[in-house]
Amino acid sequence: MRTLLLTLVVVTIVCLDLGNSLICYVTRDGKTATCPPGQKCEKYAVSASHTGHWFHRWHCTSTCHEGPYNVCCSTDFCNR
């Protein structure tokens, strides 16, 4: 009985991942991805120099871009 209980506890921990996974937006239309350990969510602005317009990129990263329109964060779905 103890073995069964221990097995269930281990399976639960593995399946739940103890909350260490970070979920970020990775596209404009709201698709998400689970980031590798140690990474953050980012939304950063990129200038299309030939048009003068800005557009955004969403992704997981270990190094965030700096800038006034950029978001770098470490909670689920924080890079909207």
Curated annotation (Swiss-Prot):
* Record's keyword annotation contains Signal: yes
The species this protein belongs to is Micrurus altirostris (Uruguayan coral snake)
Q: Which GO terms describe its cellular component?
A: extracellular region
Q: In which tissues is it expressed?
A: Expressed by the venom gland.
Q: Which InterPro entries match?
A: Snake_toxin-like_sf
Q: State the Gene Ontology terms under molecular function.
A: acetylcholine receptor inhibitor activity; ion channel regulator activity; toxin activity
| Function as written in the Swiss-Prot or TrEMBL entry | Neurotoxin. Blocks muscular nicotinic acetylcholine receptors (nAChR).
- The residue range of the signal peptide is 1-21
Bridged cysteine pairs (disulfide)? 24-41, 35-60, 64-72, 73-78
Location in or out of the cell: Secreted
Alphabetized, the UniProt keywords read: Acetylcholine receptor inhibiting toxin, Disulfide bond, Ion channel impairing toxin, Neurotoxin, Postsynaptic neurotoxin, Secreted, Signal, Toxin
Give the protein's recorded name: Three-finger toxin MALT0059C
